């Protein structure tokens, strides 16, 4: 797997201060994607053990709330295979930090159902993620007023609660004063 960018102090892609990893490779090709350069699986630099260690070091400070995975597409099967061992390390070393993941795949229909995104790593990778922002970016549904989403069709899902209940459970941002607009 390659990655296009790492941000060690990101406040735009999840709650609080985050370390964000932008992986390379995406087959969605959303119209007006903010990161279309990362569609190419060969874009950027190789994701190595040194990269993992640098990210783990960046997660150490107490002010860092967690890790965000973006792309490209973290749930392309080849990316899942590279990310799963890393996410296990993050969970082991930082059990109190949260993991957010942005994906164009739908949680209930494609990641939990049958689709090209499913592979031997999918269920375990989902079990390590706290919050999933799912759904392709749709330019016609774009709004700058959305918290942590680009378009109104995207959902912010509490993965742990959704897996426990078998139903989609929205992540609770409203109770913490973050306005969310839903149609």
Language-model features: locations:
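Conserved Radical SAM active-site core
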Residues: 1-4, 17, 35-101, 105-115, ...
């Amino acid at each position: 797997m390659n990655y296009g960018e790492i941000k060690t102090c990101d406040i735009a892609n999840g709650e609080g201060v985050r370390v964000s990893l932008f992986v390379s490779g995406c087959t969605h090709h959303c119209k007006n994607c903010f990161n279309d350069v990362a569609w190419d699986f060969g874009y950027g630099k190789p994701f190595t053990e040194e990269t993992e260690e640098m990210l783990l070091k960046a997660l150490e400070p107490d002010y860092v709330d967690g890790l965000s995975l973006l792309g490209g597409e973290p749930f392309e099967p080849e990316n899942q295979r590279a990310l799963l061992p890393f996410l296990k390390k993050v969970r082991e070393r930082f059990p109190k930090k949260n993991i957010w993941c942005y994906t164009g795949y739908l949680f209930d229909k494609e990641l939990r159902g049958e689709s090209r995104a499913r592979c031997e790593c999918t269920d375990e990778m989902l079990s390590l993620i706290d919050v999933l922002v799912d759904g392709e970016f749709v330019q016609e549904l774009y709004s700058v007023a959305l918290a942590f989403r680009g378009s109104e069709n995207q959902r912010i899902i509490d993965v742990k609660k959704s897996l426990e209940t078998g139903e989609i459970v929205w992540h609770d941002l409203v109770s913490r004063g973050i306005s969310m607009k839903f149609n």
